[in-house]
Regions:
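Bacterial N-terminal signal peptides
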Residues: 8-22
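Positively charged n-region of N-terminal signal peptides that target proteins for export
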Residues: 1-6
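Low-complexity, acidic/polar, glycine-enriched regions of mature
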Residues: 24-194
């Protein structure tokens, strides 16, 4: 009986130890609060061969990331598509319309990643998904990131096909007018919140 009690007690200690370590490990990736004035989410499209840069002025991000805790890192960015700004009122109105983002029906674009690959001390790939205009596709997002104390800086870019997301219909399907590939860019600076 005493032997059985010792076995049960030992197993209980082991289980609680694993739970404690697991929880501590899962909480190790710090959360980051964005410095909005130093962060930017944008894109570069091509119209008749000329590059057209733009930014999204409103977005929210939930970022838990650390190079030494990639298995516990995750990113979710929600972008208000209505906030697009290409420095042209007429063009922005067109981009918001049903022909492109259809912001009335699809007010958010969402990037989410929970799997990360480290290529070098400061180079990574986020394996995630991008949702635009109600269409979700897998995407690999290469980026560089550095953590110094309670400061995070990251930047990266990736190309996506606008046609995969149904962006640009009717006359805008012509890739000689609007290029098929759009380069998504971002610069993020954040401060640790825990």
């Amino acid at each position: 009986m005493r032997f059985l009690f010792r076995v049960i007690f030992s197993v209980a200690l082991l289980v609680f130890g694993i739970m404690f370590l697991g929880r501590s490990h899962a909480e190790a990736a710090p959360l980051w609060s964005l410095k909005n004035d130093q962060s930017k989410v944008g894109f570069v499209a091509k119209q008749s061969g000329a590059e057209i840069p733009g930014v999204f002025e409103q977005y929210q991000a939930e970022i838990a990331f650390h190079p030494q805790e990639l298995s516990n890192s995750h990113i979710r960015v929600e972008i208000a598509t209505e906030s697009v700004n290409t420095q042209s009122g007429d063009r922005d109105k067109l981009i918001r319309s049903n022909a492109f983002f259809d912001t009335a029906a699809h007010p958010k674009a969402i990037f989410e990643a929970t799997t990360f690959e480290q290529l070098s001390p400061d180079s990574f790939i986020a394996h995630g998904s991008l949702t635009m205009r109600g269409v979700t596709k897998e995407i690999d997002l290469p980026f560089q990131a550095s953590v110094e104390g309670d400061e995070l800086r990251a930047q990266g870019e990736a190309e996506v096909s606008r046609l995969d997301y149904g962006i640009g219909n009717g006359q805008w399907l012509d890739t000689a007018v609007i290029g098929e590939m759009v380069r998504i860019t971002f610069v993020i600076e954040g401060v640790a919140t825990k």
